Amino acid sequence: MKTLKITRLLSLIATLVFMLIAFLPKAINETDDWIMIVVLAVAFVALPTNLMYYTKREKSSRYLVDTENGMLLLNIIVFGILLIMNAVGLVVVLINGGGSYWGYLSWISASLYIILNNIILYKAKKTLSANLQ
């Protein structure tokens, strides 16, 4: 569970740094391209790690395993799409040396990942606690 929290924190940090780089370009010096590449790599590693721990460690709860509500399938589809967006963003940033609009797919996907993952996790915990009462 600690690894899951750490990778979620890494995703959040990566998202915040990308938003700063994207919206505050005057505050960043010439090294912003390398900062983008490093932070994008962190987000790229954090997303699949989150997916792995989310599906392996938390699938024991009855709510997530229940295929009738499709939560696990939704997780796999959503995280798969976000991982593809992240991979595309990483490749384009590496090819262009940063600063590309395609590179911003990475922080968009990280933002969506954080929002959707927390909504899914909250709903799963709420339903599981209601079922146990």
Where on the chain are the PLM-derived regions?
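Juxtamembrane interface helix immediately N-terminal to a transmembrane segment
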Residues: 1-10, 67-78
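Hydrophobic alpha-helical membrane segments
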Residues: 42-49, 69-92, 108-114
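Membrane-helix interface/capping segments
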Residues: 51-74
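Alpha-helical membrane-associated segments of multi-pass integral membrane proteins
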Residues: 5-15, 19, 38, 86-133
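N-terminal signal-anchor transmembrane alpha-helix
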Residues: 1-48
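Membrane-interface segments at the starts/ends of alpha-helical transmembrane spans
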Residues: 24, 30-33, 68-69, 97-105
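Membrane-water interface of transmembrane alpha-helices
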Residues: 45-59, 119-123
